[in-house]
């Protein structure tokens, strides 16, 4: 599972996702990629499930790059506990994403095979996505 090795603070404020992605919004490594169309938070399990879906479809050929990393802790209080008495314990990690963010890139396989793999991966994600192809292909 993806999670930071060390963090300065165990808990973080929730915050709000506003605006479009400035960084990580263009294809850097591969030929075809998944790009987000809305705000959302991807858990480490969702990121891994989409990666596995891509790898199983393209089999041995090609390379896959994961362009997001879950570095924001998520907290939760136990079931049947009254409100108050402080913030809950950390239970997992998420990667906050804005519209326009590239999530996965693929290179080294046929474009149609890569497109189908990315479509399968997009079904594992909680945000609307689109498939983008690098200029000149």
From Swiss-Prot:
**Transmembrane region(s):** none
Keyword set for this entry? Answer: Ribonucleoprotein, Ribosomal protein, RNA-binding, rRNA-binding, tRNA-binding
Q: Where is this region: Disordered?
A: 1-22
Q: Name one GO cellular component term.
A: cytosolic large ribosomal subunit
> Which PROSITE patterns does the entry link to?
RIBOSOMAL_L16_1 (PS00586)
SUPFAM superfamilies (UniProt xref): Ribosomal protein L16p/L10e
Q: Where is the composition biased (Basic residues)?
A: 1-21
Q: Which InterPro entries match?
A: Ribosomal_uL16, Ribosomal_uL16_bact-type, Ribosomal_uL16_CS, Ribosomal_uL16_dom, Ribosomal_uL16_sf
List, in alphabetical order, the GO biological process terms annotated in this UniProt record.
translation
* Tree of life domain: Bacteria
User: What GO MF terms are annotated?
Assistant: rRNA binding; structural constituent of ribosome; tRNA binding
Q: How does it assemble?
A: Part of the 50S ribosomal subunit.
Function, as annotated, reads: Binds 23S rRNA and is also seen to make contacts with the A and possibly P site tRNAs.
Q: Name the family.
A: Belongs to the universal ribosomal protein uL16 family.
Q: What is this protein called?
A: Large ribosomal subunit protein uL16
Organism annotation: Maridesulfovibrio salexigens (strain ATCC 14822 / DSM 2638 / NCIMB 8403 / VKM B-1763)
């Amino acid at each position: 599972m993806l999670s930071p090795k060390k963090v300065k603070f165990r808990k973080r404020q929730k915050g709000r996702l506003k605006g479009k992605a400035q960084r990580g919004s263009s294809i850097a490594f591969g030929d075809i990629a998944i790009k987000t169309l809305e705000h959302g938070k991807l858990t480490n399990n969702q990121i891994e499930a989409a990666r596995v879906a891509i790898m199983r479809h393209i089999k041995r050929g090609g390379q896959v790059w994961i362009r997001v990393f879950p570095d924001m802790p998520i907290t939760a209080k136990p079931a049947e506990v009254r409100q108050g008495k402080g913030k809950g314990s950390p239970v997992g990690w998420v990667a906050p994403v804005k519209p326009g963010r590239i999530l996965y890139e693929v290179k080294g396989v046929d474009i149609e095979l890569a497109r189908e793999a990315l479509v399968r991966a997009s079904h594992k994600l909680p945000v609307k996505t689109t498939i983008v192809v690098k200029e000149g292909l």
